[in-house]
């Protein structure tokens, strides 16, 4: 299967380099504009793979009129992709590689199980996965309907409870004002996603953030944009780099 295009904002991650040159794989980038459909049509794809964002009544008919279109949707609607197992199975089916998809799922499960054995965490240890999406707001995933938290749960971590005063919880996420950052201290491990720009750097300069027990006790890990994207939507390709990054962090919890 030869990919011909990807969204303009698609963060492919260094793990794709192991397969091929990303510039050769993604020869076109699609902007989310009124001309996107025409751009896709000129590429004459045999298959269109989209997130749940293209599954609405307006976008889906426009794309499926060009080529067969498959989308992924989390059961809770909390992420733009379903579980990585579901995604892998579906892609294996539509490309005629179902057996290989099953093998990949089994291999990835084995890698996760090995990581959990190599980096055991204390019973009851909890995690939160958060990111500063706006100048005045941090958003944290709060249940394991989120694909990334399901992966972290498989490593033995529970999901920290951030509900209560100071957190607006909806759609599987908690919106925290900067004044309520101390809610992050409910987690034994805080994983912060850096979504680019100066938002994370500015957050780290603020006294309230610096005063968090998790920060002072070195229980915070900040992921770059590629790994943040990976944890938001884990796949068999990006799970090994996530394990490599998070393994030493899990070891610190057990120390």
Which residues are covered by each model-predicted region?
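A short, structured surface patch at a secondary-structure boundary
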Residues: 1-41, 48, 52
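Hydrophobic beta-strand scaffold residues
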Residues: 3, 69-70, 159
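Alpha-helical, coiled-coil/dimerization segments enriched in small aliphatic residues
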Residues: 10, 141-173, 227
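Extracytoplasmic substrate-binding proteins
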Residues: 65-135, 232-255
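Ligand-binding pocket segment of bilobal, Venus flytrap-like solute-binding proteins
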Residues: 118-119, 123, 132-135, 139, ...
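Structured C-terminal subdomain patch of bacterial secreted/periplasmic proteins
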Residues: 184-255
């Amino acid at each position: 299967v030869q990919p011909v295009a990807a969204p303009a904002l698609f963060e492919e991650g260094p793990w794709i380099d192991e397969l091929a040159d990303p510039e050769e794989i993604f020869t076109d980038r699609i902007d989310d504009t009124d001309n996107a459909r025409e751009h896709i049509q000129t590429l004459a794809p045999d298959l269109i793979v989209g997130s749940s964002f293209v599954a609405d009544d307006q976008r889906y008919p426009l794309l499926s009129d060009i080529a067969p279109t498959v989308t992924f949707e989390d059961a809770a609607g909390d992420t733009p992709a379903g579980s990585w197992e579901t995604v892998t199975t579906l892609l294996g089916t539509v490309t005629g590689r179902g057996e290989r998809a099953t093998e990949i799922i089994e291999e990835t499960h084995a890698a996760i199980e090995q990581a959990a054995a190599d980096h055991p965490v204390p019973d009851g240890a909890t995690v939160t996965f958060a990111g500063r999406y706006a100048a005045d707001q941090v958003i944290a995933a709060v249940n394991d309907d989120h694909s990334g938290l399901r992966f972290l749960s498989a490593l033995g971590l529970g999901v920290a409870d951030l509900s209560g005063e100071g957190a607006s919880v909806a759609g599987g996420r908690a919106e925290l004002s900067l004044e309520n950052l101390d809610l992050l201290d409910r987690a034994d491990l805080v994983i912060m996603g850096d979504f680019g720009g100066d938002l994370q750097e500015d957050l780290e300069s603020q006294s309230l953030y610096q005063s968090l027990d998790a920060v002072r006790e070195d229980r915070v890990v900040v992921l770059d944009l590629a790994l943040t994207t990976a944890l938001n939507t884990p796949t068999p390709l990006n799970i090994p780099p996530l394990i490599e990054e998070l393994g030493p962090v899990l070891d610190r919890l057990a120390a």
